[in-house]
Amino acid sequence: MKFNEFLNHLSNYEPGKDIEVIAKEYGVKEVIKLASNENPFGTPPKAIECLRQNANKAHLYPDDSMIELKSTLAQKYKVQNENIIIGAGSDQVIEFAIHAKLNSKNAFLQAGVTFAMYEIYAKQCGAKCYKTQSITHDLNEFKKLYEAHKDEIKLIFLCLPNNPLGECLDASEVTKFIKGVDEDCLVVIDAAYNEFASFKDSKKHLEPCELIKEFDNVLYLGTFSKLYGLGGLRIGYGIANANIISAFYKLRAPFNVSNLALKAAVAAINDDEFAKKTLENNFSQMELYKEFAKKYDIKIIDSYTNFITYFFDEKNSTDLSEKLLKKGIIIRNLKSYGLNAIRITIGTSYENEKFFTEFDKILR
């Protein structure tokens, strides 16, 4: 059977291996997953209780207006319901943005190394990709590339903080850059990890209400997969000018998010104690990862997320990843990004100590 030609130019996204697969493949009893930036404390207690109470409603289609979650988000971010769209993860909203703006006759712009799905989705539309030489977000490079190809570039991705590297721009730098972008070019701010960045440094905090008030061409993305521990329920959102949201709704299938995900998201966003515990643990434990890196002269980029990336000169990241798997520890090998590096999710104190103990043996 023949398929569309563009499929020949696409690669599959490579997620981290599952715990069950590793346990069976390597014959290990205990497996620690530090690969997918999931919340180490699991699902928020309030969301768990909500799921228990609503489990008998799994046969029902969701309220397609999603009014309860939209109202909760609108109150949190000081925007209107009409400024919000809910997706099956923020990935789906990324897909909406790409299909709304890109085609085979135009292009998009991104950092040299960033979230892989931008390029995967955009290639489905045949769009051209412009990347900075820098692997991180160098806005001077962004500006030069944009100015050189302004007629082509109709969408710009800013991943703040950046996955898989962890760096983050100051909010003032971001707004200054957007002022130089034409109104017909959509600027997507992927803020999947911004709660972590804001907790660490208030200068990194991005406020959607201020962004969409000042700019008609900005889309702010958020997710419940990281801080709020609902990755398995697949729910995220976009906040933008009402005209942008209205256009996206033409691309959205009805009932795209389950009723259980919608209910759990409302509960999770109101579980302040869980969020505080997650953030405090994350950055206290990250200091231990920095100390470990210093001990072995491993290069790092200061991370504003719930993960840290280790860069190697002589050691091979694929070899290191394989050795860790044999010890029952799953991390993310970044060879597919062209980097000799590994990304490690910040886990619980127990999980992190297990990583340090085993990785110490490997590096000796």
UniProtKB/Swiss-Prot annotation:
Record PTM N6-(pyridoxal phosphate)lysine, positions in chain: K226
EC number: 2.6.1.9
Keyword annotations from UniProtKB, A to Z: Amino-acid biosynthesis, Aminotransferase, Histidine biosynthesis, Pyridoxal phosphate, Transferase
Coiled-coil region(s): none
CDD domains, per the entry: AAT_like
Cofactor(s) the protein requires to work: pyridoxal 5'-phosphate
SUPFAM superfamilies, per the entry: PLP-dependent transferases
Pathway membership: Amino-acid biosynthesis; L-histidine biosynthesis; L-histidine from 5-phospho-alpha-D-ribose 1-diphosphate: step 7/9
Subunit structure, as described in the record: Homodimer.
Protein name as it appears in the record: Histidinol-phosphate aminotransferase
